[in-house]
Structure formats: C-alpha cells, structure tokens
Amino acid sequence: MTDLISVIVTTYNRADALDAVLRALSHQTDRSFEIIIADDGSGPDTAHVIESWTPRLPMPLKHVWQENRGFRGAEIRNRGIGASSGRYCIFLDGDCLARADFIATHRRLAESGWFVAGNRILLSRGLTAAVLAQRLESETWDIAVLMRERLRGGVNRLLPALHLPLGPLRKIHSRAWEGAKTCNLAVARRDLDRTDGFDTHYTGWGLEDSDLVVRLFHAGVRRKDGRFATGVLHLWHPESDRSNLQGNRARLDEVLASDRVRAMRGLSTMIDSSNQPPAVLQ
C-alpha cells in the first residue's frame, strides 16, 4: 500500500505523554502519513505541545478538539476521522509510544478486507514517571534493555517487542473481537465509512472499540494480527472511571446478537462545529 496514512491520536489533558508520542512519531522511517490529534477537551497545555511540534514535524499535524463533557472517546475519534485525508487510519492512544518502524510495518500489513489489531507493552507507574521526567526515548530500547526492565518490574511483558514473520498465522483469529483496542488499531477509511465509524452512544470508558470491530465483522471485514510486528509502549495511567461500563456492555451485547453494520449514531452524524482548542498563551 502506498496511500497516505492518517494516524489518529486520542488525548485528554496529558501534555507530557503527548509530547513523547509526537517525538516517537517524528522518528518514523516511513514518513508518508499525517497526524490528527483527537482531543477530548484538554486545556491549553495540550495545545501548547501541539503548537511546539507543528514546525518540527516532517509530516502534517492537525488538532481536532471538542468541549470537555466527560469521556467521549467514540465521538472525538469520529471527529478525527472526519478531519483525516488518508485512505488508511491507524488509531493510537495519546500515551502509546510507537517504535521507528511502526508506520512502515502497519503499511506492510495493510490488506483490503482486513483490519490490523496490534498490541502493547505496559510500563509501570515508576518507569513511566522516569520516562516522562527524564525524556527517555523508551521507544528506541532494544530487547536487552526491555528484558532488564522486565526483571525490575518496569514492564509487564516482552513479546510485543519481538518481530516474527507469522505469515498466514496472522489470520487465524479473523473473527475474534476480544483484545482489539484503539490504542493500536488500523482500519481502511472505506471500511470506517461503511460502518459509519464509532457509535457515539458509547460514553465513559469501555467497549466502543469492540463495537466497531464487531460491526466490521458484520460488514465482511476480518481481523489480521499485528502482534510480533506493531507493538507499542503504553505509559502508565490511573484506571479510568468505569461507571458507564455496564450500559456499554449492554450495547455491545445487542450488537453481538445482531447483524447490524452501521453505528446507531456514527460518523455521518458529526456536524462541523466551531469548537477550537484553548488559546496558547504566549
């Protein structure tokens, strides 16, 4: 695939982590991509980070913002999709650091009729604090460094850092929705349009990504495994409020029991607004 890729990075009031994410993306070996920051209501610190990176990046950077009205991950991702120009979208969380071959590997794995679900290594709270405070480029660490951190309890596992040529084994879980998360998920734009993107009835933490994956299955799109190829380093963060999880699970169960393809309230319902991120104070 040679088309432009859109990397849609969701964030909320975590400017130091976003700075590290943009640093990692700036070092990609494949530079034929754009970055869309999908901002779920952050304050001026986030806008300042984005402004500081805009002239330094060798690829376009856009900032899409919506008012803070609680966790609205589905809606802000739809706004990110709407602002994107690529024919292939990679969703990445604003605290996930991509290794230098992340874009190149996703491009190589891209295939018509398939989406790619990657995985992650979780960093501990202490190691995350050190990475951010000392501006450590942890996305460049080799397996030896990661192994030392594993022995110290700094990371939870090593396997996502390995690169293995799995070939046809990447398709053996083609109908499994579990474990496919928007911290590392790649979907063709035409498939997002067919499914109408994320369902914004999902609010609060949880399962809006699973809902999308199930509807992709209903549309005939299958899952390709990005493990041992596209792993990212996921910085620690406190557990999100899960008070809406029960309602979100009920919505997901309904989709699982149906053959519905399109979101109940999705990408096509997004209306362009004049929402602007908070001004950066000079």
Model-derived features: positions:
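Short, flexible, basic/aromatic active-site loop/helix in glycosyltransferases
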Residues: 136-177
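Short aromatic/hydrophobic "clamp" motif used to bind/position activated sugar donors
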Residues: 89
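Acidic donor-binding segment of Leloir-type glycosyltransferases
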Residues: 22-67
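Glycine-rich, basic loop-to-helix element that forms the pyrophosphate-binding segment
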Residues: 67-84, 101
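A short, conserved alpha-helix in the catalytic core of glycosyltransferases
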Residues: 179-196, 202-222, 227-228
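Cell-envelope/extracellular polymer assembly enzymes that use nucleotide-activated donors
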Residues: 3-6, 34, 211
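Conserved donor NDP-sugar-binding/catalytic core segment of glycosyltransferases
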Residues: 101-150
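N-proximal low-complexity "stem/linker" segments adjacent to membrane-targeting elements
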Residues: 1-27
